[in-house]
Amino acid sequence: MVKHYSNSDVEKWQKEGAVIIKEIFSPKDIKSVHDDIDKVFGYKEGGAPKTKNHGINVTNEKQFLNFENIPLDCSPALNLIGVHPQLIGLAKDALNTKDIRLYQSQAWAKFCGETDFEQSFHCDYGNHTLTVPSKDLTQNSITFLMYFSDVTEEHGPAHYVTRTDSEKIDKISEKFIDNSSDISLQMLLAPYERTTAGVAGTIFAYGIDIFHRATNITKPGAYRYAVTSCFKKARNDTIGYTD
């Protein structure tokens, strides 16, 4: 298989815990998955944006209103995109293994006006392991957040902080464990945040120790279509899907 990602992409993920990759999927792949998500969730439509103007950004259930585990009642395009050969290859290289397992995959549609999608910075390891992330990065996992609609800053892209940037903050992990919603923690991370905005087909690959957050959809009538998939090393029982 000819790789559509580079060694530098793998090295960047291993060092920074996050990398943006484009041109993995063909235009046909992108359109087919978009059309499938449209079939599953497209009876909905975006409205006027909702914005909470005070207090810390809190995750709420409505942010996951259209977040469904795959497989779904649609064509193979959506149901199989999370195990695309390029993703499997990248996951193997990133985790330094020849044997991996998919342990969760979802389709995710967001529509403007359903809620304020803004979140605080957080790490995902609480949903993926009963422990804390391993210092051996290959014993953690890799998550792919893939966009199947064009995502500008008005369409609610995820924002993130690289590992090396977060490590500039003294005792950042302890601060997060002590109080993940502490506004001072959020203020320390904010200067380092980066965007995942990109055209349909953009992939955000990140680790469970990476600080990231959702942002609000502010363009009236807009939507964001995405798919997630998560991989771990085979026989790594410390990683799993905990809802």
Regions found by a protein language model. Give the residues of each.
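A structural signal for short, well-ordered beta-strand segments
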Residues: 105-107, 144-146, 227-231
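Short, P/G- and charge-enriched loop/turn segments at secondary-structure junctions
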Residues: 128-135, 191-192
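A short secondary-structure junction signal
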Residues: 114-121, 130-133, 154-163, 169-173, ...
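Secondary-structure boundary elements
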Residues: 92-101, 134-138, 148-155, 167
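Double-stranded beta-helix
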Residues: 138-141, 151-211, 236
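Non-heme Fe(II)/2-oxoglutarate
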Residues: 3, 43, 47-51, 90, ...
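Short, structured patches in soluble enzyme cores that scaffold and shape functional sites
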Residues: 106, 123-125, 146-150, 162
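Non-heme Fe(II)-dependent double-stranded beta-helix
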Residues: 1-15, 22-129
